[in-house]
Swiss-Prot record:
GO terms for molecular function: rRNA binding; structural constituent of ribosome; tRNA binding. This is Large ribosomal subunit protein uL5. It comes from Caldivirga maquilingensis (strain ATCC 700844 / DSM 13496 / JCM 10307 / IC-167). Keywords: Ribonucleoprotein, Ribosomal protein, RNA-binding, rRNA-binding, tRNA-binding. The lineage of its organism: Archaea, Thermoproteota, Thermoprotei, Thermoproteales, Thermoproteaceae. The gene is rpl5. One of its GO terms (cellular component) is ribosome. Belongs to the universal ribosomal protein uL5 family. One of its GO terms (biological process) is translation.
Length: 197
């Protein structure tokens, strides 16, 4: 049973403040073992800087409600006209209510269907070919159409120990989120259909 009844929600009009990210958890019987959405990273690889990148940045900020971070080329590729250090991509990381809000809309764009190969231990990634498929987005002929990738990371309480600055530590093997638990989270909490190989 999904955390919310998606048939009662208009994904075009929903706002992050309408959601509570704490409700989107998979209860595994112990409070420290529950699984929740840690982050949703939205990536656009444009492959060039200039006007097209600026248009993509405008589209991404409309989609996510956040200002994107510019990602730089790691090396020069003469054939593609890319120089090292040149901005060629965009990234936005969403957390909590905003992460759930965007993820529901992104999943609606792919019909709440994901391939089994998209999952690994605690993560799932999928792509959307055209941003206009996302509910609530609109087509602007001056900007064009862009595709993007969505990467979702799941976590349990206590995962902060691997990211904090002081007394950093690894998360134990038994406490990590497995691939099977990741698939179960998306099926049970978000109502996603999994396409088998």
């Amino acid at each position: 049973m999904p955390a919310i009844d998606l048939s009662t929600i208009d994904l075009r009009a929903i706002k992050p403040s309408d959601l509570d990210w704490r409700k989107f958890t998979l209860d595994t019987g112990h409070p420290m073992r529950r699984i929740f959405i840690w982050s949703v990273a939205v990536n656009m690889g444009i492959g060039q800087s200039g006007e097209r990148l600026e248009k993509a940045a405008k589209v991404m900020s409309e989609l996510t409600g956040r200002t994107p971070s510019y990602r730089l080329a790691h090396k020069s590729i003469k054939d593609f006209g890319i120089r090292r250090g040149e901005p060629i991509g965009l990234l936005v990381t969403l957390r909590r209510n905003e992460a759930v809000w965007f993820l529901l809309r992104a999943l609606a764009a792919v019909d709440f269907t994901l391939r089994e190969e998209s999952f690994n231990a605690g993560n799932v990634s999928f792509g959307i070919r055209e941003h206009i498929l996302v509910p609530g987005s609109r087509y602007d002929p001056a900007l064009g159409i862009f595709g993007f990738d969505v990467a979702v990371t799941l976590a349990r309480p206590g995962f902060r120990v691997q990211y904090r600055r002081r007394a950093r530590a690894d998360v134990g093997k038994d406490h990590r989120v497995s691939r099977e638990e990741t698939i179960r989270f998306f099926q049970d909490v978000l109502g996603v259909r999994i396409l088998k190989r």
